[in-house]
């Protein structure tokens, strides 16, 4: 898709819905790659930073960097390569109060980079934002992510992809069906 606009990203993402967001689907991943692969590359290169000029653009840019990356690069270190950049944009969006200008039902997507961080202080900061949403399901997920970071200091399910050696406690957690991310 050429000349993608923030609205294109948002319309696509929100039309997809919970089923596609949280269940692995090679077809959905392929659709993101086909429609937004170049958009992702442009975002990584900083060519879409201007989207941060308004709330909807900020939301779209964060989704591209924080969510599309996970669909584009499953089982690849690049799935998390833009997490720092996405978090930086999320923090900027919050600082500029863009989050409160976005409907509460989709606001969690601005906060997702906090949930994806392996830094406990960032996780704790994010919990405050997620608590404001008054969405028990989203809050439960945020708490689960933070608990894993409290326990291990990182997400063990990323270890094999990132070339990290799992500790015995992490391996036990993974073997017992621990969080898969």
Q: What are the residue ranges of the model-derived segments?
A:
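Intrinsically disordered, low-complexity activation-like regions
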Residues: 1-59, 64-75, 80-181
């Amino acid at each position: 898709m050429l000349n993608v606009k923030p609205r294109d990203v948002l319309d696509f993402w929100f039309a997809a819905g919970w089923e596609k967001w949280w269940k692995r689907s090679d077809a959905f991943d392929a659709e993101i790659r086909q429609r937004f692969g170049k958009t992702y590359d442009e975002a990584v290169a900083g060519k879409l930073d201007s989207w941060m000029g308004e709330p909807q653009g900020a939301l779209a840019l964060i989704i591209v960097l924080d969510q599309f990356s996970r669909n584009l690069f499953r089982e690849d270190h690049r799935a998390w390569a833009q997490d720092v950049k996405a978090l930086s944009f999320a923090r900027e969006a919050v600082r500029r109060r863009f989050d409160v200008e976005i409907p509460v039902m989709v606001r969690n997507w601005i906060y997702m980079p906090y949930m994806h961080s392996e830094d406990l202080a960032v996780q704790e900061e994010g919990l405050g934002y997620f608590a404001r949403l008054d969405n028990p399901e989203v809050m439960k997920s945020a708490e689960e992510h933070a608990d894993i970071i409290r326990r291990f200091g990182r997400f063990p399910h990323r270890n094999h992809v990132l070339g990290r050696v799992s500790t015995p406690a992490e391996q036990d957690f993974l073997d017992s069906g621990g969080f898969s991310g």
